Amino acid sequence: MTAICTLENISLIFGDTPIFHKVSLELPIGITGLVAPNGSGKSTLLSVLHGQASVTGGKVSWRRRHHLVKQLNPRLDLRIVDCLADGHLYEVFLRVEQGHASEDDLISVADYWHLPLTWQRQLEEAKINAPLDTPIERLSGGQRAKLSLAYAFSLSSDYLLLDEPSNHLDQSGREWLQEKILNHAGGALVASHDVELLENVRQIIEIYQRGLKTYGGAYSAYMQQKESEQAALLQRAEDNRKEFNQLNNVRQKSLHNFATRQRQGKGKRNSQSKSLMDSQKDRAGKGLGKLKRKLEQRQLQLEKKREEISKITVIESQRLRPQKLSLTKCDSRKSIQLHLENLQLPYGSHDKPISLTVRKGERWRIAGGNGSGKSTLLKVIAGQLKALSGVCQTRGSLCYLDQGFSFLNKELSALENLFYLHPGRKESEWRTMLGSLRLRGDTPLLPLRLLSGGEQLKVALLAVTRGTIATDLILLDEPDNHLDLDSRQLLVNAIMDFSGAVLLVSHDLSFINAIGVDSQLNLD
């Protein structure tokens, strides 16, 4: 199988933390999945492949052009056309259309007359119904994601490095994404927790203990192989424990038998001649030396078995160690937490007035396609945007978690952000809470921009839910994005235990059902 890209003995260290150690890999033609728990280095590996992260050892060799699509949205000061092509060409086409084009303008677009139709087709396929000069900040998170992906798929011969590409996409957007990936001739490496998307890959690469392991087949085949590996690992641990106990029993028995023979021999030697006693003493010395060597060998075997058992135990404990997250208790005695009446949104395709009453303990889903106004509605409720008209009343305190964690300073560390937002808590308290979310060691001290999307989300969840003020209403804008399956279950459990009201935007039906959504507002 021809390799598109080769990694040779790649090593990477952040501070004192090793991320990869002498990793080698060949990326084949076609679609490959990349999986790992949050914070294991998926985004970092994509940056290494793209040449944006400097390695401490080894080299990366490409045989094809490649393009990276990051999790982060495009710059908000750009227009749609700037994300699809050189904005200068768009300005030239405008002057041509208006009859103001110069001779230099006509020369500059001589080979690009097809571009305006291409841009329009890309927007139509991605279901982005907006003019080319629309500012990016006016688009929803899903529309921004599709815009970045649409440009990537236009590079038909490039190998694509896609970082959580299904994040923020509605169901039709996810179907569009799957079709585009399957039909992309250049191939792709897809880092994702989206099981449905990973069922379309030819093989899966797993980041495992600072290295990489490759599994043939799609996600379901990968899970079967992982389960077999886990069963074999546990069986090996059990076999090692049995062998350890047997070796230890033999060692103890040998020591006991030798001590018994020594006591019996001492009684006999008291009645024997000196020459005979010397001869027996010599034989006993040789026997003792032989026994010592035998016991030393047994001791080495015991230590080896103990080390193997310890390694397996550590691996298993890391896999099974539960994360902990609890939301602050609802303090309000009022039944109604939110009341909307004839609310008119400032942005989004939903142009009808919205009326809604949310009571304590209710779980509401805000449904609708990308661009319908779901995030806009949450921002209006949170007081970050002003409605065109209508009534928006909240009672008690609310927490709002937006898609981009905009309230966090990405240049500051997790601890610095938490101290700034909640100065009343001690460092030891934040350390304990971060550790319970598997953010340990130097990780809480690194700038947030160096953490994975899932790790940043955990910090954001702590920031909005673990302050000293109780929360009555929580607004969550696609919180299941970025999270691995284990962390997603953690969030489900926390929401289920919360006694206040929840307004949720999500496109993941399994997540929606898991948290017990009992009501829905549809903006389509």
Question: Where on the chain are the PLM-derived regions?
Answer:
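Coupling and communication elements adjacent to P-loop NTPase active sites across diverse families
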Residues: T2-I13, V92-G142, Q225-Y347, R359
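ABC ATPase nucleotide-binding domain signature region
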Residues: I31-T32, T44-D104, R363-S372, T376-E429, ...
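ABC-family P-loop ATPase nucleotide-binding domains
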Residues: R75-G141, Q403-D472, E478-N481
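Hydrophobic anchor residue at the start of the ABC signature
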Residues: L149, L461, L491
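Catalytic Walker B motif of ABC-type/P-loop ATPase nucleotide-binding domains
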Residues: L160-E164, L169, L401, D472-E478
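Conserved H-loop
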Residues: D194-N200, A221, L509-I515
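H-loop (His-switch) and adjacent beta-strand-loop-beta switch element
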Residues: V201-G216, I515-D524
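Flexible loop/N-cap segments at domain edges
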Residues: E303-S406, P423-G424, S428
